[in-house]
Structure formats: structure tokens, C-alpha cells
Amino acid sequence: MTTPLKPLDDAATSFARRHIGPSPRDVAAMLETVGAKSVAELMAQTLPGTIRQATPLTLEPALSEVEAIGHMRALAAQNQVFTSLIGQGYSGTIMPAVIQRNILENPAWYTAYTPYQPEISQGRLEALFNFQTMICDLTGLDVANASLLDEGTAAAEAMALAERSARAKTKAFFVDRNVHPQTLAVLRTRAEPLGWQLIVGDPVKDLDGAEVFGGLLQYPETTGALRDPRADIAKLHDKGALAILAADLLALTVIASPGELGADIAIGSAQRFGVPMGYGGPHAAYMAVRDALKRSLPGRIVGLSVDSRGAPAYRLALQTREQHIRREKATSNICTAQVLLAVIAAMYAVYHGPDGLKSIARTVHRRAAVLAAGLRKLGFAPASDSFFDTVLVEAGANCDEIIARAESQRINLGRDGSRLRIALDETTTADVVEAVWRAFGGELSYAAIEAEARDAVPAELKRQRPFLTHPVFHAHRSETEMLRYLRKLADRDLALDRAMIPLGSCTMKLNATTEMIPLTWPEFSSLHPFVPRAQAAGYHTMFADLQDWLCRISGYDAVSLQPNSGAQGEYAGLLAIRGYHAARGEGHRTICLIPSSAHGTNPASAHMVGMEVVVVGCDSNGNVDLADLKAKAELHSAKLAAIMITYPSTHGVFEEHIRDICDIVHAHGGQVYLDGANLNAQVGLSRPGDYGADVSHFNLHKTFCIPHGGGGPGMGPIGVKAHLAPFLPGHPATDAATPSPVGPVSAAPYGSASILTISYIYMLLMGGEGLTRATEIAILNANYVAARLDPHFPVLYRNERGRVAHECIIDPRPLKQTCGVTVDDIAKRLIDYGFHAPTMSFPVAGTLMIEPTESESKAELDRFCDAMIAIRKEIAAVEQGRFTIEASPLRHAPHTVHDIADDDWNRVYRRSEGCFPEGTSRTDKYWCPVGRVDNVYGDRNLVCSCPPIGDYAQAAE
């Protein structure tokens, strides 16, 4: 007699089960610890009943990992990979395989967080230091930042920098008519809310009579023309204005640098240094400035300091410029940048070195010169005889026919009216050049035409100064050396591949391998953002699905995928609110209410759209003070534009009165911007659009699994209710029929499109039920950590039923009074236990905010809690007088191999006590490469790039 087959347990093998850390047995034990009978009961105790969604979240049925990859293959097949010679700041490039495998596909690099804890971030800080050095060398300027979001927003940031810093105090800014069109569009978006006038024209003819605070010139121009900008720069300086050059990095290896030409600021994209076009991104933009402007530079800057032993150590420098400290007075609202892409670009330069980069540039220029010679022979004279890689010709009535012939050979050309633009790159072959000639009606031989080609870089613009002279750009020529260098840097850092990263408000969850796989497929990575839409059909199917799913999750009616960071999403959402009020004849509504606990990007973003920030107080429980809100809403009723509020709150609690908050603001004519940074506590349980919010951004690099990349890339799409949908960001590449009244906030129409594949696969794999379960376990994990730590470090905020949301704030501040222990001491001591610190001093100074996410297992949560409890015992030893805080392992943390190998150990605690604290493994210990970094020294002695090799020679003498 046979035994019937048992029914299959799909949950045991589903992706959701692998994404979610705690097992069913773990969940039962954790519920017992937190004092709840079930997950459902815990949710009822955590979320206000007034906001719970009435029906379960319904998406498509969850797929297996194999099925999801098959689905992505089908989508990829709908995209057509042509050879795109469109230009406009996007180029084909070749990512060295050693970089693809060991950075882009390596979780040691892509799962790390922003390097606010420098001791455990030395690898990527060195890589970013290399990036800054590369940018300084190529631009000929003194200080560079560690990346911006894209070239268009970098130009806008440079415009704002010029307005702050120029001697001229006008409200007008000059833009060369030959900048990239998308850059001009982003500049228009940024300038209008601030009341700045853009003067767009020919700098030769139109700059003389213009009174401006700055000017932007493209170098080379978007047309390809290479023109000497020195006279234009001199005109700007004579007016007290700052001169900005948007410069092509590869071109700068063979043409004069912006610094040599007299520019004050240089901006651009590092995309063509090994980073695929990705249908628009992500790519690292750059900005470099002369020394006098360094303290106004937006974004992050890596500087060189020293550690506790006096050894060199990298850190983020001049952080007082940034939004998390300066708020509405910050130099920018930028938070997430493009660290992973900056690292790739820097390593591209390390891999090739200066000679390799010059060889690539000369090859590209040679092919362009040969192309131009052939076009002349065919009767199409280039518009300019001076160019680097792009040739522009007048095609007249033949334009459509030429484009059709090119497309029949799977080649895309750029078009501007009746003019055609052919932009070459390092992937361009002689066969491609011959195919372009055929599109223009000629059968020419590359070899025959090559002899007729002439150098198109004018002698006065040829680069004379050396670059990339530091040894790091010369020491890794072989793949063996390059591989080992990348491994050495990765080993210095602590990322999710080693341990839990319990950062509050950051949602450092699992980035599953399957989600990352399609990212490097050419069908997704090799598309130019301005190809004909028919060539990107797979992308647009994915976009439509994502927009639909995000609407179902959030309760909104429309979604824009364009914002390429959370801060950009905030900006786009506030622009939508501003546009809505203006369309109703209420453009005078400019007051934005922001709770005192808000993230620093909120007030910075409000300032950027021309709003005035009015701070609303919070009560002793961390909730918005309703009385204060009512008073300020009434006081500013006639001018009230919006409130920006985070939900659950930045204090880690679901506020009971969120509906009341929304109603109060709506009653006074305002709109509700609900910051989606904490959406990981809501998916499947509550929908912002249902309880009163009008607009939110979604941090796809938090809730929806795009990895943080060590500080970017990120994506911040926004969802809006129907009345705000007409005011979502537009783009000149997609707006021909119905232009949006709000311009673009990003250079590409769909932002960093290629990484949307990650969030898309995550949703495919999880389905509605899996996403809801992830939310529930994220909340359970946070309450479990709170329950375990509360007897040792009091949990500062809970709701009326004693629950936290998906994160909790613990309060060590009394310990500073009793024994001098600081939050910094605890954070650095956690490194000795193998952990990244929780979020420090936000939103409450001197506290720690912990967010475990749903991906961490009970075992890892216990390891973290055990470490925190052990640290509390060490603090007790200080309180009891065993040693002073200055002599304790807390103040000497983190401990390094230099400490354990110190022959002169003279501390009052044992070497093993410092280096191998209670509960840590001696076989698998993470050793940070430097001791505690001296922040004050680093800012007082600012070094932001590698010194040139000549400095080493002088030192040797």
C-alpha cells in the first residue's frame, strides 16, 4: 500500500522565506519576548486602527527566483540594443571585467552604507579619494566632491553655488545655448522657484550686455564644437560672476583643463569612465572648484585626517555644510549621491592610468576625424572644424532618410532639427564609421579615408599639463594587481555581507543576488536614454508595472519614476504642490510647516522651491504638537502651502493623530507631503493616500531593496493624488505632445532607470502577501530589539500601547552625566564587536536609533543585543570606578591589529578585553584598519586629493 504524497509547503521554499530573516520558530520566541500573542496582535498594538488598510495588498502572484529571471529575460528581449551615437552627455563605454566582477557585482561594495563611520569605511573612502584626485587632476581645479547625482543637477548645484559666492549680486544666470538640452531644462526647473532669470544665448554675442552672477559653458559643446572659452570666462570675471565649465572627462585627457582656462567651477558626468548608460543612469556626476569655494561645495567631500595613533585615515570632511546639520541653510539638499558609480569611474582610471586614458581618447578622436573626412567627401561638411568626438552636419531634406538608413543598420544618430549629430566613443569601431557613411549614402573605406583625416583639436586647446601622477594610477596595470587592490580595499570595510547594519531611518535590508542579476545585461545597461521609445519597450512595460504597484501599495493615483534620490523626490513633490497652488491662482502660498524632528533634507528641499520654513514643535513623546500645529496653521492660513511630515515619525512611532494632522493642514488650504523614508513600516498595512497625504516619495534604496552602494545610487520616485498628477516632473525628451508645467528634476526622463530592475524583481518575488509579511517582521524585529535593550538603555519613545514601529531610539544620555560616556564611545566600541553603529544623534542629539529590518535573523539580532548589553557592562565598570572613561576600552575603541601587536601595551585593561570583547569570535573577527579618526584635525588640515608625484620627490629631497 502506498503512502499519499504530503502537500508541498511553498512557504518553506519561497523567496519571501529567504528574504525574511526570522524562522517561524524564531517569530514565536520573539513574540513571547515582546509580550504579544501573535503578529496580528502586535500590529494592532503598533498601528492606529484609523489608518489600517481595509483590504489586503494585492499584487501579481509571487514568482520563484527562476521564474523571475525568466520574466526579466522576456522583458529584456523587448529592448533593442542599437549602437547609439546620440551623444548629449551619454556615451558607450567598456567596463573592465575585473571591475564588473569585483565592484559592481560584489556585495562588499554594493551593500555598504554611506561612510559616516570612517573607521569601518576606509576602503571606499580611499576609492572616493581616488575619484576626487582624478577629478581635480583632469579639471585642473583644487577641490572636488565625492560625486553628485547627474550632470544636469550638478549644473544646477553649480548655479546655486555661484549665486551664493559671486561678487555680482544680480538674479540672472547666463547659459550657453549649446549646453546639453536636458541640462538647460533642469536649470530652468531649479531657477524659477528661486526667482533667478536664465539668459540663454551665444556667449560671443550675448554675454557683453548681460549682468549675471555666473555663466555655464559646455566644453566641448553639445554640438561637438570645441571652442576656446577663455574670452567668455574673462567677460564673466569682469562682471564679478563665476565661470562654470561643463566638461567631458575623456576629452580632458587631451584638451586643456577648465582650471588652465580660468574657470572657477567644473561639472560633468563620469559616466563614460566605465559606467553603462543604463537608459539614463545611475552615473556619478562631478564638481570641482577653486580653493576659495571649497566651503560652499555641495555634496560629500572625503578628506585625509589621522587616527588615534597618528596614522593617516580618511573621513568625510566639512560636514557642517550638509543638510543633516545645516537644514534649510545647507549648501544643497543632497543626501544620497552616487558612490558606487564614482568608485567604478575612479577604478577605471586606476585600471587604465593616464597613458591608457589618453590612448582611448586619441583613438576616439581619430575615429571622429576620419568620420568627418568621409562626410566631407560625401558632401556633408561638419559644422565645426574643431571637435573631440562629435561631428555635427546639416542634412536638410535628407534627414529622415539618413536616420532611417542608420536605424536599418541598428545605429541611432542624434538629431537637432535638420542637423544630425554623430557622437563616437570607445566602443566605436571602423565598421561603425563605415556604416554611418552608408547611412549618408556613401560606400567608403575606413582605411582609405584615414589617410585624409586631420587633427581637429586646435593647438591652443591641446592639454599640456600632466595628470594622474600619483602612484595609485600607475601601480595596477596588470589584472592581478588590480584584483588584489580591489580586494584589499573591500576587506577594510564593514558591509551587509559581514554583519547587520542597524541604522535607523536607513532600512539596510537584504539586497538579494537574484535582484541584482539583470542589472548588467546589455538589454538594460546599454540603452541610451534618448533612443526611440520603441527600442525600450521592455523598460516601459516595467515602468508601467512599477507605477501600478506603487500606486496600489501607497494609495496614490499617479507615480513619477524620474527623481533619482530621496532628496530629489522631496524636491519634485514640493514642486508639484507649488505648481498646484499656482494653477489655482494661489502662488502666494509659500509657507511650509516642518516638525522639529524632521530629516534635514526636508527644510533644505523646501528652501530650494522658494518656500519659507516654519517649524512645528513636538511633544515629550516625540509626536507633532497638535496645539502648536493648529496655532501655526491658523496663523499662516492665507499663505500655507504644505506640511512635510515623516510617518511613522522619525522618533520610531506611529503617531495616533496623523489623520488629524492632515485634516488641519487641508482645512487651511495646504497640502500634505508625507516623507516616505519609513515606508518599510507601512507596506501592506496602511496607505498614505488613504489617510490624508497628497504626495510622498518612495526610497527604493530602502523599502524596495536597491542597495545603498556605500552612499548611492538611490531612487526616489514620487506618488501623488490625482489633483497633483498634472504637476509631476516633465522632460524635454518625453514632453513633445503635452509639456508638463513642471520641468525635469533629473537629467534623464526616468532617472536611474537601470536600477529600477532591482525593485521590480523584489516585488515580483514577494507579491502582496510577501511584502506585507516583510513589514510585519520589520516591526516585530524592532520591538524585539527594544524589549531586549530597554532594561539596559531606555527606549525613548513608544506609542500609547508601549510599541515602537520599525525602529527605536535608545537613550544613553544619562551615562554622559554619570561617567562621561558619549554616544561616540558606544558607536566606536560596537566596531570591536563587529557591528556598524546605529544612527547617532538623530533625531535626538546624544541618542542611538536602531532599525533592524525584516531581513535580519533572530540570531543576528541577539548578537547585536548581546553586544550592546556587554557594552553597558563596560560602562558600569566605569561607573563603579574600575577605570576612568579616558582609560577605558570604550574611549580607546575601536581596537586594531596595531593594538593587539603593541609591544608597549600599558593600558589598565587586558589586551584581550579590548581586542576580543565578550561574545566575539577570535576566528571570524572584523579588524578595522585604523583607530578612532580625528575629525577636528581633518577639517583644520583639509586634504581632499592625493598630492602629485612631484610633492613626493620634494619630500624625498
UniProtKB/Swiss-Prot annotation:
One of its GO terms (biological process) is glycine decarboxylation via glycine cleavage system. Its EC number is 1.4.4.2. GO terms for molecular function: glycine binding; glycine dehydrogenase (decarboxylating) activity; pyridoxal phosphate binding. Its cofactor is pyridoxal 5'-phosphate. Pfam families: GcvP2_C, GDC-P. It catalyses: N(6)-[(R)-lipoyl]-L-lysyl-[glycine-cleavage complex H protein] + glycine + H(+) = N(6)-[(R)-S(8)-aminomethyldihydrolipoyl]-L-lysyl-[glycine-cleavage complex H protein] + CO2. InterPro entries: GcvP (IPR003437), GDC-P_C (IPR049316), GDC-P_N (IPR049315), GDC_P (IPR020581), PyrdxlP-dep_Trfase (IPR015424), PyrdxlP-dep_Trfase_major (IPR015421), PyrdxlP-dep_Trfase_small (IPR015422). GO terms for cellular component: cytosol; glycine cleavage complex. The modification N6-(pyridoxal phosphate)lysine is found at K702. It comes from the Bacteria. The glycine cleavage system catalyzes the degradation of glycine. The P protein binds the alpha-amino group of glycine through its pyridoxal phosphate cofactor; CO(2) is released and the remaining methylamine moiety is then transferred to the lipoamide cofactor of the H protein. Belongs to the GcvP family. This is Glycine dehydrogenase (decarboxylating). The gene is gcvP.
